[in-house]
């Protein structure tokens, strides 16, 4: 782990550190109080730093949300790790390679024709990406936080990656926060594969949500199906929440506006 820089966020105590694990960039923030919870976030470019975010100066404001919610609950704030995707001019589809569930497509799931030129099964790298997170990044930054107190969060492709990670690594974290999961990549077949791969209910918690504007406007039929399948599997009550946010879109500003709710869903348990 090589440190690149440190920077501060208004209203957030301490520094955010930017480090490198091989070619993978990571931003992370540790609260001044000893953290007992850990949040792992995809698309780390958008978590803390408005100068690196997809939409200029639009971030998740994740540390601010964590501080608000933890103070209201009377607990120490969680540590937050933001893992950058690898998209660049040289690797224009790097984000998709990192986040799209590799095993499903390697085993024959057919991608929607609109994405066939982008998603090539043998080029997907999500398994290697997740291995780096769990075997290198987390042990180096937050080695003493229990998996039972660890959550993962992502939006769009990051939402898919979060659910995939829970199915593939259920012993590594116990709460999945999937905002605006991008089901249209493969439609109901992707929904079925994802839900059937999740661990048996009883120990894990799952949050899913979407808006009604932009890309999110197409998600409702798939999410309704996902909700039905998940409840059929036995996820219910405090273990599963699915929300629709009217007039909410597909961008960091929209997700940040309601982030306190999934944050509380996780931390209040």
Model-based region annotation:
Residues 1-269:
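Non-catalytic cap/lid and distal C-terminal segments of serine-dependent acyl enzymes
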